[in-house]
Amino acid sequence: MTKKLLPLLVLAALSSAAHAATPPNTLVVAQGLDDIVSLDPAEANELSSIQTVPSLYQRLVQPDRDNPEKITPVLAESWDADAAAKTLTIKLKPDAKFSSGNPLRPEDVIFSYTRAVTLNKSPAFILNVLGWDASNIASQLKKVDDHTLTLHWTADVSPSVALNILSTPIASIVDEKQVAANVKDNDFGNAWLKMHSAGSGAFKMRVYQPHQAIVLEANESAPGGAPKLKSIIIKNVPDPASRRLLIQQGDADVARDLGADQISALSGKPGVKVLSIPSAEQNYLV
């Protein structure tokens, strides 16, 4: 696995005139969205999907922002690892809620992992590393009490590897009750979650128009508190040069994935900041 630097251009708040075109309390992002197949965390496996899912969903744990090698709790309050038994005993945060208002339960975690493994979509191979598959997943996840569950795995991996796997987007926790209300033909709510959300992230889905835009609105009941922004508008702008133009005109606050020519043209411009953000990437030699 390597790290790739993804250029990100931010129109800084110091340029008030440039910001006049964007709505207050709203972040406008320009990027390509044509690669998106689904925003269901059990299926999302494209760059634009993976960039969006963490705003809508949380995992039990996640890498520390300043030290990615360290795993920190999110929906989990704490955990105990038993390497010999290949088991994690996880206590959930008792006050965590989904955007629907439903409280987080062990059943939601069990449902989330079970549906991801059973649906067996593109990113399911990540959970398969634990030895989980549709034939054994039911025996690997057990509720202990209203705020505790145990996770067992069969593969020969350490608890630290298991925790890293549980920090990936496919391990996002969905609201079982909300998803169950939108199941069709035993699809675990997959068709509905392609374009809706049922998570506990800082934002929830307001509308998704494929190949056009994604609009997110603040989740006021998000664990950790509501975000400062009221909404995020992600516009589909396939052409990098057009993304650059939106930044220059003040019609976007952020432009993702600009090429070297666009970065060179904007570097040093008043009110514009170039950020290079490390991103995990897998490369295969065939």
Which role does the model predict for each range below?
Residues 191, 219-265, 276, 280:
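Ligand-site clamp/hinge motif
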Residues 30-83, 114, 196-200:
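N-terminal lobe/hinge region of extracytoplasmic solute-binding protein
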Residues 91, 129-182:
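Surface-exposed binding/hinge segments that line
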Residues 1-19:
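Gram-negative bacterial Sec-dependent N-terminal signal peptides
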Residues 77-123, 150, 243-246:
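Aromatic- and charge-enriched surface segment that lines or borders ligand/interaction sites
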Residues 109, 147-149, 248-257, 270-272:
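Alpha-to-beta junction loops
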Residues 167-227, 231:
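Gly/Pro-rich hinge or "lid" segments in bacterial periplasmic/extracellular proteins
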Residues 24-33, 77, 87-90, 109-113, ...:
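Short, well-ordered beta-strand elements
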